[in-house]
Amino acid sequence: MTLEITGSELIKSKLIDAPERSGVYRMFDVNKQVLYVGKAKNLKKRLTNYIKSNLDNKTLRMIANTCFLEYSITNSEVEALLLEAQLIKKFQPKFNILLKDCKSFPFIKLRLDHDFPQLLKYRGKTLSDGKFFGPFASSAEVNTTLTELQKIFKLRSCTDNYFNSRTRPCLQYEIKRCYAPCVGKINKEDYRDLVTQVKDFLQGRTKELQENLSRKMEELSSQMRFEEAAEIRDRIKALSYVQLKAGVSDVVKDADIIAIVEKNGHYCVEVFLYRAGQACGNIPYFPTSTENSTKEEVLEYFLLQFYQKQHVPAAIIINHEINDKENVIEAIKKINNILQLNITVPNKGGKAKLVQNAETNALFSLEQYLKKFAKNQEIMFEIKELFGLSEIPERIEIYDNSHIQGKFAVGVMVVAGKVGFDKKEYRVFNVHAPSLVCHSRESGDPKRLMDSCFRGNGIKNCGGDIKGDDYEMLRQVLTRRLTRLRQEPHKLPSLMIIDGGKGHLGVVKEVMDKFEMNIPFVCMSKGVDRNTGFEQFHVIGKEVFTLDKNLPVMKYLQILRDEAHNFAIKNHRLGRSRAIKISRLDDIEGVGETRKKALLHYFGSYKAVCDATIYELAKVNGINKLLAEMIFNVLHRKN
């Protein structure tokens, strides 16, 4: 049921039929974009609160923008909590407390489907086909742990293809980071013993592991096998060092320690991860849209959004009570399909000390965040004044392109917000000639693009040959971007910055007029000698101007431009490299998908195929000597 009236009158009209039952309501703006999702024990009472006179500014702004209102009845408060959390995650409403940049935490995965298992970094919600340890707070934590484990236990780190193709030990064996099971330098039984030791260490059974290793060292010494005994001794020392560096807790085994702090209306939630009694790192979060919100509200919304993506430990220990704790616990249990969960607020003892430590870290993180936020706001105000914007910009989109004489052309968009770059909003546009298939992060199939790029004997352009026409590239990128903005008006930028000059200004105006959109934009070009610090700014209706290179706003604009430039070059090189690799094999008559896969499977990588001799190529199933010679000649011809 939808009524097309606005604000408080809309809410009053909905109150007539609103039930006195639990449920979820949604407020929409004129474009049917979700402004707010809320839950209620009693929908009628909750909606009545919105027509009272003592509303805060945030709520007044929300009601003023509300043009449509819908609600759904639920069977229980827990069901309402679940539905609210799911809708917030799906729509990311402007006026809800949002947890952004919440990627799933990485794990260490021990494969169990191979005679010689390997340790891998794994990120994902589904934990299957292996033994998993973690989660860890960051990829860096996982990489560091994997490096230490490889030094100590020397398990293989290579892919199956690489493992199967080896005829001699690789460099990892030479630098004593692998026992080279690929060429039989260690038998299955001894390797399995190492795997068991890794499991014991990662599961926190370090005391038992060190005792077992000590017994083994003494046994080897008594047998006069001193070199092997010395290796075990070094392993014990390394384990002690890693254990000391990581930090071990006797207070908690599997728990998340979560502390929330507030300052000047901004919140920080710091999460410390403990698994098998070992500290697995910590990470701060800064929920948005927290104006006029309480700690209880912010922490409740945080927990519900956080544990939609993260694995839930046996215990969650927090520094502040939440109002609806029992229902929150039930909701998290249902989201993650678990039976047991405790959320506690300790007042004394070891757990209270861990919470206090998390709170101290949260305060430090928030102070650093606020310094960055304040500095960024000052710069944003200067940008507003410089380019005559109506308000301080909240979202700036910067555009650039990269190509070699029109080939392998890509356009990019990077996004900056209140506290810096928003990398999840970055976009890549593979610019193409009208006759070619295109691909971007937003649409298309990369294989179709590649298939369209390589025909004949030469390496053709990936992304189309548009003869180095920067204007056509920009026209395509902006056309696609503005088309998407019609579907996502809530992502409308406050300002667009284009790396270009007067000619680019005309192209932007042309595309804006075509779409009947009026987004503020400016073109930023290098000076006459293309020296940094002498950039020129081109704005419709104004003379070209430059800024003092020492001004903070000038330095900030240069940082924005450089970020877009580097992102464009990175993706251009990636596309070019991928195109060259694919085209070399695709250009060989008689080598289709099956033989190409056979080559890559046998040798393990494209580089290994290139390094292979004719004799080695002919060993691959389906490759005869004549075809091997053709492959060798094509792969070794000059570009």
UniProtKB/Swiss-Prot annotation:
NCBIfam families referenced in this protein's UniProt entry, alphabetically: uvrC
Subcellular location(s) of the protein: Cytoplasm
GO terms (BP aspect): nucleotide-excision repair; SOS response
Major site of localization recorded for this protein: cytoplasm
The protein's name: UvrABC system protein C
Classification via PANTHER family: UVRABC SYSTEM PROTEIN C, UVRC/OXIDOREDUCTASE
Keywords: Cytoplasm, DNA damage, DNA excision, DNA repair, Excision nuclease, SOS response
Similarity remark: Belongs to the UvrC family.
